[in-house]
Amino acid sequence: MPQFKQPILYTFRRCPYAIRARLALLHAKMNVEIREIVLRKKPKEFLATSPSGTVPSLRLEMTVLDESLDIMKWALSQNDPTNLMKMPEYGFDLISECDGNFKRALDRTKYPNRFPDADPAKSRDKASVFLHKLENILSPNLFGANMTIADLAILPFVRQFAHIDQAWFYEQDWINLIKWLDSFKQSSEFNKIMTKIGPWQVGDTPVMFSDLYLS
């Protein structure tokens, strides 16, 4: 068995789950090897690593983290210089709601062909219930002046929803939500972790997180 050298993150640039994992790794200043995956042509090395065959997937020396929130928690347990984990327990309830009801409604709005029995307009209304809740909480972030793991976990999905129909989204009376999202999209952290890299192939020179995002 080859000697373990460095944690390896399998990722896909636009995937909101992968985005939030990369954000946490960036904030934690964790140096991992990053491998961009083409989802329609998954390498066998990735499938051998990831039990679910989904991104993100982080290979550690003794285990594999196959859930984005687990990757976030692991990274911030190693190093949390901006206290992202410092938030009320309710923050994890919001993440669960985002990953549950909101994501289901988002998918049925964004991908109507995949869900022919779902009405995209009604699905958008269902998703909006969660966004209204966030609108009433934000000040300017979910728990005050400082970002938390909840902000980083939820924002990529709000971004994905907004991009379904940006004209409609920006017409809504979501003053706090729109400011929150726009600030996120304009942040150096977000733009760093959205840097494009080529698809990983066996034999490639390792692309390190520190070289790509932490410089």
Located regions from the model:
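Short helix-capping/linker segments at secondary-structure and domain boundaries
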Residues: 29-31, 116, 161-169
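GST-like domain detector, emphasizing the conserved glutathione-binding G-site
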Residues: 1-142
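Surface-exposed helix-capping loop/turn segments at secondary-structure junctions
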Residues: 136-145, 189-194
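Catalytic cores of nucleotide-enabled group-transfer and carboxylate-activating enzymes in metabolic
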Residues: 84, 132-135, 155-163, 185
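Structural helix-adjacent loops and short alpha-helical linkers that scaffold large soluble proteins
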Residues: 81-84, 168-172
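A contiguous, mid-protein "functional segment" used to position or interact
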Residues: 171-199
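Acidic/histidine-enriched, glycine/proline-rich intrinsically disordered or flexible terminal extensions
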Residues: 197-215
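GST superfamily/GST-like fold recognition
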Residues: 144-167
